[in-house]
């Protein structure tokens, strides 16, 4: 009998302990949710302002989300060329990409690249990062992309070659000039008299070295970081065009985020893109110093530059007729960019 009483006492004593243990387990903190990973790919090397500004974006986003979003950056076309990265962003296997092939983001962005449309980098930023830029960016969703903001891909574009100095449009006749597959560049260079060859950005150096192309066109920053000056002899400063640098994200992925996270990404994209634009200005000055020592430089006089402008005017008529832009839109850009 005594043994039975002792056994019952043991059971009674253990029951509260068991309940206490259960309640402690229930009160244990939930596991911390995994951070959201945002993979961003681009084609420029790590020394380019695009990469440096994306590092700034990463710093801002991870700080403002307290590590809730982790940004991974893949430079130098590690994830494929610009076309492949744009397609991956549309599919959602890549969350974001910047720059390059903006025509595929929306043909409306071609309006930025019309020859001699802008007179200053400050004017470019007013347009691309203002209400006009927002209206143009909105067209990207028709092509399965969402543009957080649009910046400057490197400043005004110049022409280099290894055959002769370019002083007049006639000097370009017969020269094979490499260009990306952007219609406005192709049409403009053809209007100048050049024979255009389309070659991927990452293959341009070897194409110039092998003579597949006689020359190319790019901003100072790109010419310097890609070392195109090593395989060229002449540089003509013509400031004929600039390229936009859209910050493209996958719409479904972006809209799956909380409104708070969406706002953080948008704000950080704008802040880092302004930083990008400033970096480009500084890098352009440094790159030009390299150009002066490596190439024979021709700076066009206003009268010489006007001859190129006159040749390029046919490009405007063609794209207005195609319906990509209107004269009213061009006039608005000119007015805002002053």
Describe the predicted segments one by one.
Residues 1-4:
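Positively charged n-region of N-terminal signal peptides that target proteins for export
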Residues 8-17:
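Bacterial N-terminal signal peptides
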């Amino acid at each position: 009998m005594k043994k039975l009483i002792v056994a019952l006492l043991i059971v009674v004593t253990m029951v509260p302990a068991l309940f206490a243990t259960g309640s402690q387990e229930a009160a244990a903190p939930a596991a911390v949710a995994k951070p959201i990973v945002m993979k961003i790919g681009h084609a420029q090397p790590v020394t380019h302002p695009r990469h440096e500004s994306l590092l700034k974006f990463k710093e801002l986003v991870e700080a403002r989300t307290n590590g809730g979003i982790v940004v991974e950056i893949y430079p130098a076309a590690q994830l494929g060329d610009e076309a492949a990265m744009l397609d991956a962003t549309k599919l959602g296997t890549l969350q974001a990409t910047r720059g390059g092939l903006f025509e595929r983001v929306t043909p409306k962005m071609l309006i930025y690249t019309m020859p001699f449309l802008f007179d200053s980098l400050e004017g470019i930023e007013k347009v691309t990062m203002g209400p006009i830029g927002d209206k143009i960016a909105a067209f990207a969703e028709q092509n399965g992309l969402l543009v957080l903001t649009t910046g400057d891909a490197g400043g005004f574009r110049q022409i280099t070659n290894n055959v002769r100095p370019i002083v007049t449009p006639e000097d370009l006749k017969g020269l094979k000039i490499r260009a990306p597959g952007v219609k406005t560049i192709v049409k403009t260079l053809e209007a100048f008299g050049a024979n255009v060859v389309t070659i991927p950005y990452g293959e341009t150096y070897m194409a110039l070295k092998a003579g597949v192309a006689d020359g190319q066109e790019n901003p100072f920053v790109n010419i310097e970081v890609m070392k195109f000056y090593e395989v060229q002899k002449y540089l003509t400063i013509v400031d004929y065009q600039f390229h936009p640098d859209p910050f493209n994200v996958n719409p479904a992925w972006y809209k799956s985020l909380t409104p708070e996270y969406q706002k953080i990404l948008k704000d950080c994209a704008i802040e880092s893109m302004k930083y990008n634009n400033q970096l480009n200005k500084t890098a352009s000055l440094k790159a030009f110093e390299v150009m002066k020592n490596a190439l024979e430089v021709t700076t066009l006089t206003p009268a010489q530059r006007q001859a190129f402008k006159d040749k390029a005017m046919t490009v405007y008529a063609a794209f207005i007729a195609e319906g990509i832009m209107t004269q009213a839109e061009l006039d608005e850009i000119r007015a805002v960019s002053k």
